[in-house]
Amino acid sequence: MRKRLVISISVSIYLLLSIWPCILCQSSFAEVKGKEEPVQGGTYRRPLEFMPRTLDPVLAADIYSVSVIHQLFDGLVQFDQNLNVIPAIAKSWKISHDGLTYTFFLREGVKFHNRREVTAEDFVYSFSRIIDPKNKSIAASLLEKVSGFKEFQDGKTNSVEGFKSVERYILEIKLSDPFYPLISALGTIHFKVVPKEEVEKSGSAFAKRPIGTGPFKFVSMKEREEIILAANPDYFEGRPYLDRIAFKIFHGAPREKILKEFKERSLEESFVPPEEMGEVVKGKPYLFLQKPILSLRFYGLNSLSKPLDNQNLRKAINFAIDKKAIVSEIHNNQFHLSKGILPPGMPGFDPGKNPYPYDEARAAGFMSEAGFPKGEGLSSLEIWSASKSEAAQKELNEIRSQLSRIGIQCVIHFETDWPKFESMLRSNKAPVFIYAWYADFPDPDNFLGILFHSKSKNNYIAYHNPEVDRLLDQARAERDYLKRMAMYRKIEKMILEDAPIVPMINHLFQMVYQPYVKGVEVNALGGPYIPMKKIWLKKRE
């Protein structure tokens, strides 16, 4: 899921995460967990770089919203530390041989925060909200293969044929065609269960006063300041250790400010700016956790914006940017250099690809083919960023300098209000923009389908290739895993040939924690999906 330049934002058993080491300095959470008995109590103060746009799962479209929603709600399934799909409210499930019928058997006694029990009807309602066009959910495309999807969206029916409460604790989902990413997609933030009576009573206010089933309950929100959650004593997996979570909103402030407050012990965790990495990791009592995550930060090239509808110009931009120098010299190698769309560790990843190595001569050649030799006749390009951090500004200035060498002049703009920035992307008003996508679920479709299918609401670059659309639809229906992965590799190659983006980096989850923080578990989906129900605070002596 999405976003930032620091911006943004969002595997079953076959994900080979063993190739990715988890680095933990000073101490090991795993070792500590085995030696010490968790204790209850305390408030965990967690920073958010921007204000979440919503706390309603169906409307979520950024990592800041996900970070909070994940603590408030549950779905049918969830991901473990290795991204296997495991039970949540559904204790078990079965899938028909033809891939068209999914049957989920729910736990009894799971309660919403208003103390009403969850039933299969609640999932029918919650999933129907995703499809409802009034909600404009970015997850609606994941349910296109559900029987009755189009009829419900077009207002021809009052219910979705493919969602059925067979019994009080049995839910059935019927598809018109196979969609094999579905079971993994059901673990994403949008497929959480909500109580119909509370949504209808609160209306749009539900997004600011949510009621879920999760380990923490909503308490209060101060716009651009903080969001407070409290432990749910009736949680079906048991009461969490923490009494409260206080999300502190920094509203686009530099990460240096967040780290400063952390050092003053006003926060339990912090991001680590590149220039601070050495000091924080070495010789300090803090706990530093690092792990690669399924993500991609890129420059989007909006094909609706002239002259970026010119494929050769887009290729020139790709060849002109020295990504390796930017990662090493500006970001101190805090990121992995990206060579494509799918990140390392994602099924379908091809380690051998590198379609656009830095090559100024080839960039100049494509400028000529585009009709703009040495930039002649080319107007300035506008680049937009939601981050105004020191590192972001350095990178953007370097990008501007590199592009100027082949005759492309750039004007840099900042919009640090995330909802405004996202709204600009949705309306295709940013010709070039920096953006990051964090996986919502561990499947290639979560990158290739969500970002590049012409019908996807997250296709902010207005990319449209009918053959790519056709192959994406075909891959989603392919039961054979190896064939499916081969199809996604072909799709990625086709997209990269069209050059609608400039892939830059794959993120590393890098956070520093106070030495008394215990029980942190991070999977390759990164920080927003950390189960805070497992965190506890060792009492300070």
What is each of the regions a protein language model found here?
Residues 31, 37, 327, 409-426, ...:
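Extracytoplasmic/peripheral linker and loop segments enriched in polar/acidic and small residues
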Residues 47-97, 128, 209-211:
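N-terminal lobe/hinge region of extracytoplasmic solute-binding protein
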Residues 91-142, 172, 261, 307:
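Aromatic- and charge-enriched surface segment that lines or borders ligand/interaction sites
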Residues 122, 131, 138-195:
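Surface-exposed binding/hinge segments that line
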Residues 207, 234-280, 409:
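Ligand-site clamp/hinge motif
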Residues 223, 368-439, 481, 509:
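Ligand/substrate-recognition segments at binding pockets and active sites
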Residues 231, 309-401, 405, 464, ...:
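Append "and occasionally in soluble cytosolic enzymes with long acidic Gly/Pro-rich linkers
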Residues 511-541:
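Long beta-strand-rich cores associated with HINT superfamily self-processing modules
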